[in-house]
């Protein structure tokens, strides 16, 4: 296993791209600190660092829409990670399967899978 200390964190954070393991759809991007990455490796459930709340969070802890991590890949520069996951429910807090549910024109192109008001 790659030593987590050899990764290139910027201000203690590393970018994490989350992708569905089977469909390869990009679900979201978030940041991880070393603790979030360690917890993800240990538990098999995605954990991230909230820059706004300044705290660790387990993806899906409130909604139940967990990300079961099947594989973690490191990019060539060692400054970002790719989580290949089995997504339970939606990844986006707006109710969509992916956070990338709109195109640049503003049109909704993604699948809505839950109503946020029913979950949060």
From Swiss-Prot:
Sequence positions that bind Mg(2+): 75, 77, 79
Protein keywords: Amino-acid biosynthesis, Cytoplasm, Histidine biosynthesis, Hydrolase, Magnesium, Metal-binding, Zinc
The keyword Cytoplasm appears for this protein: yes
UniProt key word Magnesium: yes
Cellular component terms (Gene Ontology): cytoplasm
Pathway stated in the Swiss-Prot or TrEMBL entry: Amino-acid biosynthesis; L-histidine biosynthesis; L-histidine from 5-phospho-alpha-D-ribose 1-diphosphate: step 3/9
Entry's EC annotation: 3.5.4.19
Binding site for Zn(2+): 76, 92, 99
Cofactor: binding details: Binds 1 Mg(2+) ion per subunit. Binds 1 zinc ion per subunit.
Disulphide-bonded residues: none
Gene3D superfamilies for the chain: 4.10.80.70, Phosphoribosyl-AMP cyclohydrolase (3.10.20.810)
Catalysed reactions, as listed in the record: 1-(5-phospho-beta-D-ribosyl)-5'-AMP + H2O = 1-(5-phospho-beta-D-ribosyl)-5-[(5-phospho-beta-D-ribosylamino)methylideneamino]imidazole-4-carboxamide
Cofactor(s) this protein cannot do without: Mg(2+); Zn(2+)
Oligomer status and interactors: Homodimer.
Protein name (Swiss-Prot/TrEMBL): Phosphoribosyl-AMP cyclohydrolase
Organism: Methanosarcina acetivorans (strain ATCC 35395 / DSM 2834 / JCM 12185 / C2A)
Name of the coding gene: hisI
């Amino acid at each position: 296993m790659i030593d987590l200390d050899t990764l290139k964190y910027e201000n203690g954070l590393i970018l994490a791209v989350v992708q569905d393991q089977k469909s390869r759809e990009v679900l979201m991007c978030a940041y991880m600190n070393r603790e979030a990455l360690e917890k993800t490796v240990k538990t098999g459930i995605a954990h991230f660092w909230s820059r706004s709340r300044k705290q660790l969070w387990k993806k899906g802890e409130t909604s139940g829409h967990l990300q079961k991590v099947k594989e973690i890949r490191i990019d060539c520069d060692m400054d970002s990670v790719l989580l290949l996951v089995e997504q339970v429910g939606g990844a986006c807090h707006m109710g969509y399967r992916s956070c990338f549910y709109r195109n640049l024109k503003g049109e909704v192109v993604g699948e809505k899978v839950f109503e946020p008001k029913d979950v949060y």
